Amino acid sequence: MAEAHQAVAFQFTVTPDGIDLRLSHEALKQICLSGLHSWKKKFIRFKNGIITGVFPANPSSWLIVVVGVISSMHAKVDPSLGMIAKISRTLDTTGRMSSQTKNIVSGVLFGTGLWVAVIMTMRYSLKVLLSYHGWMFAEHGKMSRSTKIWMAMVKVLSGRKPMLYSFQTSLPRLPVPAVKDTVSRYLESVRPLMKEEDFQRMTALAQDFAVNLGPKLQWYLKLKSWWATNYVSDWWEEYIYLRGRGPLMVNSNYYAMEMLYITPTHIQAARAGNTIHAILLYRRTLDREELKPIRLLGSTIPLCSAQWERLFNTSRIPGEETDTIQHIKDSRHIVVYHRGRYFKVWLYHDGRLLRPRELEQQMQQILDDPSEPQPGEAKLAALTAADRVPWAKCRQTYFARGKNKQSLDAVEKAAFFVTLDESEQGYREEDPEASIDSYAKSLLHGRCFDRWFDKSITFVVFKNSKIGINAEHSWADAPVVGHLWEYVMATDVFQLGYSEDGHCKGDTNPNIPKPTRLQWDIPGECQEVIDASLSSASLLANDVDLHSFPFDSFGKGLIKKCRTSPDAFIQLALQLAHYKDMGKFCLTYEASMTRLFREGRTETVRSCTMESCNFVQAMMDPKSTAEQRLKLFKIACEKHQHLYRLAMTGAGIDRHLFCLYVVSKYLAVDSPFLKEVLSEPWRLSTSQTPQQQVELFDFEKNPDYVSCGGGFGPVADDGYGVSYIIVGENFIHFHISSKFSSPETDSHRFGKHLRQAMMDIITLFGLTINSKK
């Protein structure tokens, strides 16, 4: 085969006339280009390291400071108050340096020291400024003079064009709340969920903890917070994610869907070519650290960017006791799964990224390949879908050497994983509800063996060219994948585009090596483990009751007219819907972020409050008036927003209690209070998918190009998982998951209650859905 010959730089044979050496010039050329590419990336990393290392100054400012110091010395002005003279005296005790040389060297050294001191002062000043969070608690739309001055100072110290990681060393550390404050907030959060007798018992446990064991655990936690960059994130990653022994599929991984109503081409290979190229463009921008750091409050307050580091070239490696995350700096290939076969596809040729048409060519060759799967190959990925321990043992036994290790390395060290799915998914006008549900379920779990659930992202291209992503959760949270996904969809349609016949723009290239099949030698014993994993994973997947639907009766535009937060509005609608569905309240989880702090991830907002319960009960009481309901609604919204702000600013409940629990385990002490708190089930788990890059295209002019967001599986066996995305002014998309095996839950029933709850609340304001126009 041609590609096999191209892969060999030289060959030799021994003949009677001597050694016959044959060089492959094409292979040598590709080796040289690969080396140049590698050195170019190293240089870019080195340059970016310098730029980020001197932030908020810039490297050129060093020259300005040094020239200024030396110029003042020539003008007989000593800017150092005698320090330059001291440096000069200590430079050369042998007397071999001329006085002019000593003066210049002394001036450069003093100027450099002054420059570093100014940088450290600016950085510390910025960190102090970013530690202020009073702006979050100000009344919406009203900004005090002191806040405006504070914002101006932050902007001055933030530089003109910060890179992705520029703010990392200037971000404050996540503060450790006082134990008594956390315990008090916890008791307030469970008050509406407990009977008086149970609440009094929990209050006694909590108060005993706050006085006795709590302060001891807190001392160790504070010690960690002084030493570690973030006192939560490493333990959260290890104990919540990596030590989990259950399946990643459904339980941990989540999915992202694309545009609902638009499919720019119906050619599967073409859609794959464009979108893979768009992903690679994003990766290149990320590698160069040219992504703009996300900033709040009018692009002023930066969020932590640490989670972007492991977006690509990352895989979760199974272990018997705990998993690990493997991340490599660079990967020049992807692995593509189609019809039970695994293919390795190189992403570079002639020292450049493959163009969209060239990637389409590669994908089409895979689709046209008639070869059959090797024994055990077709359903191999089921190992990543089921329990971790069998996969870890199987990996160690059958994939630690030989061709199996080489092929597994290719998968785990790929930039990302691609599935060319044989099914057709997406919105169908003749059956909108079932088609969207099927689309979501396919992205969440597929057929349990056609997604590599260990990879940071599995990119799925369906036969009818609809696309989606399945993402592993341990390395980062959903907003990072969402940021990538927004870029990919916009670049695919509005930047790259397609030809009139639906192909990628550009020309094919016959010189590109073809995709190569990964080779496996999977014995019968291993195939039995694969079959067992597939069986257990299929039971889990078939139990998922997933309902995904668009809500277009009104959106953010109309909610704003109610003078309330869209998120608070939806959260109260969820509380009302849950009560309609279950006839009771439950502990509710809403994911918030703590990325205002260095290496921050998430915090929990306990959305079921006394205020929200009072509102829901008023809505269910036919005797209550609209005025009473509206008043209670506004009180509940204000409470929710206050809790959300507390969570964002490091004053949440659950991460603090979680870390105290980890400390108690290290100290081998038992806490009945912490044990009970951490065993409470979240029967309603919710999350909003943020829209982060509204500048990519105009939603109002392109209303059909809206994303459906994404979703996740239910957290509790008898509960619901609800995700939602607010797009533009008039569109919200919901994803509801539960389990068929629970007699108490029904995702479609909950969806109907949620639609009605949204309409019931908007009616309180005397607004109709036509008010949005």
Curated annotation (Swiss-Prot):
Effect of E3R: Decreases susceptibility to inhibition by malonyl-CoA
GO biological processes: aflatoxin metabolic process; carnitine metabolic process; cellular response to fatty acid; eating behavior; epithelial cell differentiation; fatty acid beta-oxidation; fatty acid metabolic process; glucose metabolic process
Positions carrying N-acetylalanine: A2
Consequence when changing E590D: Reduces activity by over 60%
Tissues expressing this chain: Liver and kidney.
Transmembrane segments: 48-73, 103-122
Modulation of this protein's activity: Inhibited by malonyl-CoA.
Enzyme Commission no: 2.3.1.21, 2.3.1.-
Effect of H473A: Loss of activity
Consequence of changing M593 to A/E/S: Almost abolishes inhibition by malonyl-coenzyme A
Positions on the Mitochondrial intermembrane side per record topology: 74-102
GO cellular component: mitochondrial outer membrane; mitochondrion
Superkingdom field: Eukaryota
Phenotype upon changing A381D: Reduces activity by 86%. No effect on inhibition by malonyl-coenzyme A
Membrane topology reported for the UniProt record: Multi-pass membrane protein
Annotated residues for binding of CoA: G555, K556, G557, L558, I559, K560, K561, C562, R563, T564, S565, P566, D567
Keywords attached to this entry: Acetylation, Acyltransferase, Fatty acid metabolism, Lipid metabolism, Membrane, Mitochondrion, Mitochondrion outer membrane, Nitration, Phosphoprotein, Transferase, Transmembrane, Transmembrane helix, Transport
Binding site for (R)-carnitine: Y589, T602
Catalysed transformations (reactions): (R)-carnitine + hexadecanoyl-CoA = O-hexadecanoyl-(R)-carnitine + CoA; succinyl-CoA + L-lysyl-[protein] = N(6)-succinyl-L-lysyl-[protein] + CoA + H(+)
Modified residues annotated as Phosphoserine in this record: S741, S747
Quaternary context: Homohexamer and homotrimer. Identified in a complex that contains at least CPT1A, ACSL1 and VDAC1. Also identified in complexes with ACSL1 and VDAC2 and VDAC3. Interacts with ZDHHC4.
Function in brief: Catalyzes the transfer of the acyl group of long-chain fatty acid-CoA conjugates onto carnitine, an essential step for the mitochondrial uptake of long-chain fatty acids and their subsequent beta-oxidation in the mitochondrion. Also possesses a lysine succinyltransferase activity that can regulate enzymatic activity of substrate proteins such as ENO1 and metabolism independent of its classical carnitine O-palmitoyltransferase activity. Plays an important role in hepatic triglyceride metabolism.
Domains: entry comment: A conformation change in the N-terminal region spanning the first 42 residues plays an important role in the regulation of enzyme activity by malonyl-CoA.
Name of protein: Carnitine O-palmitoyltransferase 1, liver isoform
Organism this protein belongs to: Rattus norvegicus
